Amino acid sequence: MSRHLVEQINKYVGENDILFHLGDWSFSGIENIWNFRKQLKVKEIHLLIGNHDHFIKRNRVLPNVYRTEPYSQNLADGKPIGGEYPDYVEAKTLFTSVHDYLDVEIDNILVPLIHYPMENWNDRFGKAYHLHGHTHGMLPVKEFRLDVGMDNAFILFGEYRPFSWEEIKTMLDDKK
């Protein structure tokens, strides 16, 4: 399944796009955290911590599984990570940023991002679009709240893949 998810992300997200990953990056091992990231073409990934991201949440640093080979590039921006063989690197070497919660603005719309769904969010009664994961498509689209997990994409579109901003706007504007 991981290979399929990588293929789908690379198919729908361009190298110069921005990917907001709303949690549960990896359900297993440190090596999988690194390997999943290395296979993605997109350069800019903002990670919102999910309930299965225990190691990243607890430590915000990751063992460098490539410390026995000359691996010294930051996967997010290509800059050196400090020494040829560091034992540990900050999670931000894999991601552009790592957050528990993040407000972003896209097309003049406030977009609160968090792994978990909320009943109330910043500017809920304005036109903020609350995007979340965690619920595996079990919650219906409500007002301006949407589960953008890849499993919900399967329910809505018939394939595991990221949502585009255009799809999100269309779905949530219909809920006005």
Placement of each model-derived feature along the sequence:
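Core catalytic region of metal-dependent phosphoesterases/phosphodiesterases
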Residues: 1-101
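Conserved beta-sheet core of the metallophosphoesterase superfamily
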Residues: 64-176
